[in-house]
Amino acid sequence: MAKQKKHPTGTIAQNKKARHDYFIEHKFEAGLVLSGWEVKSLRAGKAHLTDSYVLLKDGEAWLFGSHITPLTTASTHVIADPIRTRKLLLNKRELERLEAAVAQKGYTCVAMSLYWSKHLIKCEIALGKGKKEFDKRDTVRERDSNRELQRTMRNKGKEE
């Protein structure tokens, strides 16, 4: 009997810009409808989520702006579109909750990360409210002060 291959674990791609641009209020886990070449590319880690977002229409969720680079060894029979829209699989209750929240002013739905869950590829999407420029500066200032505090705590223990 052939030896089973282990699936890679962990995160495939992250959207770090979304954490900077939005106040994240709630996160959801969604499945993705992918073709074979896309799964192969994701195994190789060839994905980018920068500027990707989720559009809700007709009771379905669609992932826009994600880029999955096709492998050179992929099939030549299928024309690979790296930035095609991909359907997200969510429960009906989750879709209704997202649609109600996005209908409010200032709320949007963004893709945060792609990751492996057992043998399936999942997309973490988040409901967020856009930050203003001064909010972004406050976040950076707060992060820097926390780093400085941690640094002094580490150094204080070494001095004794």
Swiss-Prot record:
Main location group: cytoplasm
InterPro entries given in the database record: SmpB (IPR023620), SsrA-bd_prot (IPR000037), SsrA-bd_prot_CS (IPR020081)
Region span, Disordered: 132-160
Keywords of the record: Cytoplasm, RNA-binding
Keyword RNA-binding: yes
Gene Ontology terms: cellular component: cytosol
A UniProt-annotated Pfam family: SmpB
Keyword Cytoplasm: yes
Subcellular location: Cytoplasm
Coiled-coil residue windows: none
UniProt GO MF annotations: RNA binding
Similarity annotation: Belongs to the SmpB family.
HAMAP family: SmpB
Task of the protein: Required for rescue of stalled ribosomes mediated by trans-translation. Binds to transfer-messenger RNA (tmRNA), required for stable association of tmRNA with ribosomes. tmRNA and SmpB together mimic tRNA shape, replacing the anticodon stem-loop with SmpB. tmRNA is encoded by the ssrA gene; the 2 termini fold to resemble tRNA(Ala) and it encodes a 'tag peptide', a short internal open reading frame. During trans-translation Ala-aminoacylated tmRNA acts like a tRNA, entering the A-site of stalled ribosomes, displacing the stalled mRNA.
Identification of the protein by name: SsrA-binding protein
Gene coding for it: smpB
